[in-house]
UniProtKB/Swiss-Prot annotation:
Keyword terms, alphabetized: ATP-binding, Chaperone, Cytoplasm, Isomerase, Nucleotide-binding
GO terms, molecular function: ATP binding; ATP-dependent protein folding chaperone; isomerase activity; unfolded protein binding
Catalytically driven reaction(s): ATP + H2O + a folded polypeptide = ADP + phosphate + an unfolded polypeptide
Main location as per UniProt: cytoplasm
Pfam families: Cpn60_TCP1
InterPro entries reported for this sequence: Chaperonin_Cpn60_CS, Cpn60/GroEL, Cpn60/GroEL/TCP-1, GroEL-like_apical_dom_sf, GROEL-like_equatorial_sf, TCP-1-like_intermed_sf
Protein name: Chaperonin GroEL 3
EC numbers for this chain: 5.6.1.7
Assembly and binders: Forms a cylinder of 14 subunits composed of two heptameric rings stacked back-to-back. Interacts with the co-chaperonin GroES.
Gene Ontology annotations of biological process type: protein refolding
Compartments where located: Cytoplasm
Gene3D superfamilies for this protein: GroEL, GroEL-like equatorial domain, TCP-1-like chaperonin intermediate domain
Source organism: Mesorhizobium japonicum (strain LMG 29417 / CECT 9101 / MAFF 303099)
Binding site for ATP: T30, L31, G32, P33, K51, D87, G88, T89, T90, T91, G415, D495
Length: 552
């Protein structure tokens, strides 16, 4: 086992504070509309330019083990805030740095670290309650756009695009952000349910120019096993032909005689038909077939339920206004499912999302939820260079997460004003002077984000903070973009309460642990063994001299 290096009390805390400061100073320059960029060297490819706090934090690794421990603890603050709220990582880092710095001074002055932490926790729960109480619910699309614009660093086009996407797919809908192949940023909305399976044979195509199969007012047969025997399918095919409506078959696979017969009938014009494989695998496939059944008002034909294909009538088939099938995707628009059944299924999936612990399962369940609840929107981020696209994609991701958080819990005035105001309404009372000192530490820390935003904009931080606190208006603040004071909500500068709350809670949690640290243990640096370095003695200067006259 390697030898360990142990540091105690003041020495340990000072090293750790140095690490906290290095990381926080690199992250906090990105805060606010006038925040600066950070350039990150990559081992391959072009350097990355970003204004995303958590991306900067994740890149920092310090040489000194003790300083690195401090930096990594604060990095954890940014990551945690990012995981829960998706934005506010820089605010969380600034708050954590302030609490650690003030806490370090208090401990050095002889205060009890445990009581300081209790005071910090009391103040934080008080502030969180105030924030939630003062939050305003989002009602209009304009408010959604405002949140997106602020989180996207003042880029109005980003805010508008996110608001438009949310309007089209609903708050539950899936909105994904991808890199575009062009210079333009665009929004594409897929309404209805789309899954990534295309037609089984190109002969099913109805539009040869676009190579898609479009079925209007179609019946949908959902079968969970393979279809290879034509005989079993005949009754249902004959019933559909009588109605002269098209038919879409979704099953594990259609092969052999069954597929050949369907293709021949399609080509002869007797039957408008298309077949696709069912989406997903295993249990997920069953669940997705059930989703499609509920959406279209049909039934999954399954041996487990004792339903044989021979006995299937038209009433067991789903219906949809339009089905569009390309080589890779199938989209079902306007299914005939009952609204209450779809809502019941949505509630069931939401319950599963809350219960699952796996991120992968959660993501897949959310995709299913979106397909049932309204559709999928894709924002394709474009730019002139790859570096620009990556930087903009970071901002769009942040803006999207912030907007979701705002819809969920409401909004408060932005620009650090909500925290600054909350510092005035902390009513918590400490049980002793050390706890009261902990409460004061939080009160001072709550000014840090507003001060940093002002400093990044080139304003005098203490004057800005003083001016905001002097004014009694709850939404009065400093617009760093224009350098004006005024009503933050009227100016459209708002923050999601979830982002502000999470940033403070995570910052205080980790900062409290750092303040109460008394010893630190790290692996001791290995001493170089004597005489190990350098070349063996006799190989000095011209050891290879005799090769001069060789002819090549």
């Amino acid at each position: 086992m390697a030898a360990k290096d142990v540091k105690f009390s003041r020495d340990a805390r000072e090293r750790m504070l140095r690490g906290v400061n290095i990381l926080a100073d690199a992250v906090k320059v990105t805060l606010g509309p006038k925040g600066r960029n950070v350039v990150i060297d990559k081992s391959f490819g072009a350097p990355r330019i970003t204004k995303d706090g958590v991306t900067v934090a994740k890149e920092i690794e310090l040489e000194d083990k003790f300083e690195n421990m401090g930096a990594q603890m604060v990095r954890e603050v940014a990551s945690k805030t990012n995981d829960i709220a998706g934005d506010g990582t820089t605010t969380a880092t600034v708050l954590a740095q302030s609490i650690v710095q003030e806490g370090h001074k208090a401990v050095a002055a002889g205060m009890n670290p445990m009581d300081l932490k209790r005071g910090i926790d009391l103040a934080v729960s008080d502030v969180v309650w105030t924030l939630i109480k003062n939050a305003t619910k989002i009602k209009t699309s304009e408010e959604v756009a405002q949140v997106g614009t602020i989180a996207g660093n003042g880029d109005e086009s980003v805010g508008k695009m996110i608001a438009e996407a949310m309007q089209k797919v609903g708050n539950e809908g899936v909105i994904t952000v991808e890199e575009a192949k062009t210079a333009e940023t665009e929004l594409e909305v897929v309404e209805g349910m789309q899954f990534d399976r295309g037609y089984l044979s190109p002969y099913f195509v109805t539009n040869a120019d676009k190579m898609v199969a479009d079925l209007e007012d179609a019946y949908i047969l959902l079968h969970e096993k393979k279809l290879s025997n034509l005989q079993a399918m005949l009754p249902v095919l004959e019933a559909v032909v009588q109605t002269s409506k098209p038919l879409l078959i979704i099953s594990e696979d259609v092969e052999g005689e069954a597929l050949a017969t369907l293709v021949v009938n399609k080509l002869r014009g007797g039957l408008k038909i298309a077949a696709v494989k069912a989406p997903g695998f295993g249990d997920r496939r069953k669940a997705m077939l059930e989703d499609i059944a509920i959406l279209t008002g049909g039934q999954v034909i399954s041996e487990d339920l004792g339903i044989k294909l021979e006995n299937v009538g038209l009433d067991m088939l789903g219906r949809a206004k339009k089905v569009s099938i390309s080589k890779e995707n199938t989209t079902i628009v306007d299914g005939a499912g009952k609204k209450e059944e779809i809502q019941g299924r949505v509630a069931q999936i939401k319950q599963q999302i809350e219960e699952t612990t796996s991120d992968y399962d959660k993501e897949k369940l959310q995709e299913r939820l979106a397909k049932l609840a309204g559709g999928v929107a894709v924002i394709r981020v474009g730019g002139a260079t790859e570096v620009e696209v990556k930087e903009k994609k970071d901002r769009v991701d942040d803006a999207l997460n912030a907007t979701r958080a705002a819809v969920e819990e409401g909004i408060v005035p932005g620009g650090g004003v909500a925290l600054l105001r909350a510092s005035l309404s902390i009513n918590a009372v400490g049980a002793n002077s050390d706890q009261t000192a902990g409460i004061s530490i939080v009160r001072r820390a709550l000014q840090a984000p507003a001060r940093q935003i002002a400093a990044n904009a080139g304003a005098e931080a203490s004057i800005v903070a003083g001016k905001i606190l002097e004014n009694k208006g709850a939404t009065f603040g400093f617009n760093a973009q224009t350098g004006e004071y005024g009503d933050m909500i009227a100016m459209g500068i708002v923050d999601p309460v979830k982002v502000v709350r999470t940033a403070l809670q995570d910052a205080a949690s980790v900062a409290g642990l750092l303040v109460t640290t008394e010893a630190m243990i790290a692996e001791a640096p290995k001493k170089e063994s004597a005489g190990g370095g350098g070349m063996p003695g006799g190989m000095g200067g011209g050891g290879m001299g005799g090769m001069g006259g060789m002819d090549f």
